[in-house]
């Protein structure tokens, strides 16, 4: 019979959070690229059908982006509370990978998201298209770093264990580990 001790409850809670969270980035990644296509088609043809489609999907993108951020924060908080032992053991590798995701991707997305959402009639069309492209690029870069971290946890490479902690030795081996290519593509 299954016992609901602290360990199993933590796993159940994390499984729920991860299952809930993954819905939003998956939709956001696809929608960001789709929004680039829609706005590009509007720029090319000036047909307002493309602009209407863009505006419709932009609202859905914004809600998904916000929900992804909120559920992602909850998930990262659970890393520290539910899995603090793993964080202490592997934090020297997983920490920088998540930091790269925040610095290179999330700030890129968040920096341009405001103009993308509210700048349609306030900035020139080419600049607005650029912001949409930057948000889409940010989602792809974010995907890269998260998949690198997840792939490393599945097939760890490029480290040594010293005094009960992982010490990175080869960041290229850590990032481009054996399971990374098929997770990315």
Model-predicted segments: where are they?
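Polytopic transmembrane helical bundles with strong interfacial aromatic enrichment
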Residues: 1-185
């Amino acid at each position: 019979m299954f016992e609901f001790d602290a360990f199993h409850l933590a796993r159940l809670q994390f499984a729920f959070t991860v299952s809930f969270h993954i819905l939003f980035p998956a939709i956001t990644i696809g929608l960001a690229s789709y929004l680039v296509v829609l706005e590009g088609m509007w720029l090319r043809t000036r047909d307002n059908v493309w602009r209407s489609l863009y505006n419709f999907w932009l609202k859905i993108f914004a809600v998904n982006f916000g929900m992804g951020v909120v559920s992602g924060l909850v998930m990262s908080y659970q890393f520290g509370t539910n899995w603090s032992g793993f964080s202490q053991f592997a934090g020297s590798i997983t920490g920088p990978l998540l930091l790269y995701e925040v610095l290179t991707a999330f700030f890129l997305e968040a920096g341009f998201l405001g103009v993308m959402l509210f700048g349609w009639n306030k900035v020139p069309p080419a600049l607005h298209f650029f912001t949409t492209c930057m948000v889409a690029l940010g989602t792809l870069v974010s995907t890269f770093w998260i998949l690198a971290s997840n792939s490393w946890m599945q097939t760890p490479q490029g480290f040594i264990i010293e005094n009960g902690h992982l010490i990175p030795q080869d960041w290229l081996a850590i990032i481009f580990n054996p399971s990374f290519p098929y997770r990315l593509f």
